[in-house]
Structure formats: C-alpha cells, structure tokens
Regions:
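Conserved AdoMet
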Residues: 2, 40-118
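Conserved beta-strand segments of alpha/beta enzyme cores
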Residues: 95, 152, 178-180, 275-278
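Non-catalytic accessory regions of SAM-dependent methyltransferases
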Residues: 1-46, 53, 61
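Mobile active-site "lid"/loop adjacent to the S-adenosyl-L-methionine
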Residues: 204-235
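Class I S-adenosylmethionine-dependent transferase superfamily signal
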Residues: 142, 217, 239-243
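Conserved Class I SAM-dependent methyltransferase catalytic core
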Residues: 230-293
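Helix-to-beta-strand junctions that scaffold the AdoMet/dcAdoMet cofactor pocket
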Residues: 175, 221, 247-249
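Conserved SAM/SAH cofactor-binding pocket of Class I
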Residues: 107-212, 238, 260
C-alpha cells in the first residue's frame, strides 16, 4: 500500500503538491478537487497565496512541517472538511476559526453580506441582528465593515457550542465590544421594534433530504444547522413571524434560502405583511436570497 505523501523524504513543495493530490485521489477524491485541496492546504500552512506557491516550489520542507502535513492529508482523505482540518477559513474580509461546533461558512453567504452592505437600509441602520449565527460569519463580517460607526450588532444561536465559537471569533477580530451574543431560539427574545436589519442563514433543508447530503457534511457538520423541518421552511417561517415584532418600521429582513424556495419565500413574506420583497439568485443562477421590509 502506498504511503501518505509526507512519508517520502526529502520533500519539496512541488513534490508534496503532486504526491498529496495523488494520495487524495487514491482515497476517492476527484483529480481536480484533490489538486485544489492540496494547493489550499499548502498555501495555508506556508502562509502564502495560491499564486505564490510556485515561488516556493523547490523549498525543502522541514520534518516537523512534513509530519503536520501528513496528518492533515490523512484527515482530508478520511472525509473531514479542509476548513476543519486547517482550523481557520477566510470569509468576506475576515478570517474565522472553524471547527465542528458550527456550519462551515460558504461563498454564497458572502454574497448575502454584500447584499446587506449595498442596501439602503444599511446606510441608516443602527441595530443589526443575526439569527442562527454559527461561526459568527455574517454578523462579524458586517461588524468589521462597520468599524468606526455607531452600529451595534446582536448574534443569536440555539447551540451553546456554536455561540462559543462565534464569541471566540469576535474576540480574535477585536469586535467583542460591538457584538452582543444571546443564547436563544430565533428572534423572539429580542426587544420589540429594536432592529433595523434582521439577517439569517437558517437551516432550510427538508428533514427527509438531510440524510442525502454528502458524507463529508453528514459526518462532520452539525445536523441542526441543516435540518429545516418537514418542508425546510419551519425556521424561516418563525423568523418571518418574529421579524414582524422585532424590526423597526421600515426595517428589513434578509435571508439565505434553498434553491427551490424562492416562490414560497416570496409568498410567506408578502402574506406576513412585508413590502418590497425581493428573491435573488446566487452566482450559480439558483434562488438563494430573499428579503423584505416591514411597513
């Protein structure tokens, strides 16, 4: 049986990239994905950009680093997400600690942050709340963008483990003084008419479909971060209802949604009395975002 790439010595960066990708392929990963994972892993460990890896191609790696990479390649080959293996991951303009306490932030959610930052309500918003904060990705990216302003932020999560991770990220980013963390279920515990913006990337996959998710998700990421009830809309419905109580007049609700939930979300928002309802697509052309303003 062939060994993990780091057991071959001496190893240059170039050789490890080749051997690492081949190792991942032997463990069932597609070639393109294996090459990408190997490059990301090496660039993070060497603290350089992906484009700069070629500049380090002939660098001989120290034994301690080789052993560290060996273990990391093994973890990735076993199906553990690279975000958890590395322990940190970039999101928007911040770096987040990532582990099994919370869902891994996705690129689609960065666009949700951008939609908020481009909105008219953002310009005047003073109080912003994130429901189901997870790693804190959304609320901390917004708080980072608002440095030097009078904006204040609240992050809510039902999972104490996820909330502790979000608090660690806030502390690491120097944002603890502008973000309040609340252990709770939904937005119902927030004061009435207190928020200018309510945002959430909630669980939106139907319970019956959760078990069909890829193994690297089911085996490592928290199930509660995916399971949205029988039709995937349970938590979305509750936040829409809560929003009618906690949003200020003209406050706006922003959601990330499932790719087949656009029409349902439009109807739910309009029936709850929201105006200027928008359902938008992500960069892959799928319905991914819904928003509406409270009259």
């Amino acid at each position: 049986m062939k060994t993990c790439p780091s057991e071959v010595t001496p190893l240059t960066v170039e050789r490890l990239l080749e051997a690492g990708a081949a190792y991942l392929c032997r463990h069932g990963m597609e070639e393109e994905e294996a090459q990408s994972q190997a490059r990301i892993l090496l660039s993070e460990v060497l603290h350089c950009s992906l484009s700069a890896l070629t500049l380090h191609a002939q660098r001989v790696l120290e034994e301690a680093l080789v052993q560290r990479l060996r273990e990391q390649f093994k973890r990735i080959a076993s199906g553990e997400p690279i975000q958890y293996v590395l322990g940190t991951w970039p999101f928007h303009n911040i770096q987040l600690r990532t582990d099994a306490r919370a869902l891994i932030p996705r690129p689609e959610t960065e666009e949700l942050v951008e939609r908020i930052l481009r909105s008219e309500v953002w310009k005047r918003a003073e109080q912003i709340a994130d429901i189901g904060t997870g790693t804190g990705a959304i609320i901390l990216a917004l708080a980072h963008a608002a440095r030097g302003t009078n904006k204040r932020f609240t992050a809510v999560d039902l999972s104490e483990a996820a909330l502790s991770l979000a608090q660690e990220n806030a502390q690491a980013l120097g944002l603890s003084d502008v973000v309040t963390f609340i252990h709770g279920n939904g937005a119902g515990g927030l004061p009435a008419c207190s928020c200018d913006i309510l945002v959430s990337n909630p669980p939106y996959i139907a319970t019956a479909e959760v078990n069909q998710l890829p193994a690297h998700i089911l085996d490592h990421e928290p199930r509660m971060a995916w399971d949205g009830g029988a039709d995937g809309l349970d938590i979305l419905r509750q936040i829409i209802l809560d929003g009618t109580q906690v949003l200020k007049p003209s406050g706006r609700l922003f959601f990330e949604i499932g790719d087949e939930q656009g029409l349902s979300m439009q109807r739910l928002l309009e029936r709850a009395g929201y105006a200027d309802v928008v359902v938008a697509r992500d960069f892959a052309g799928h319905h991914r975002y819904a928003e509406g303003s409270l009259l």
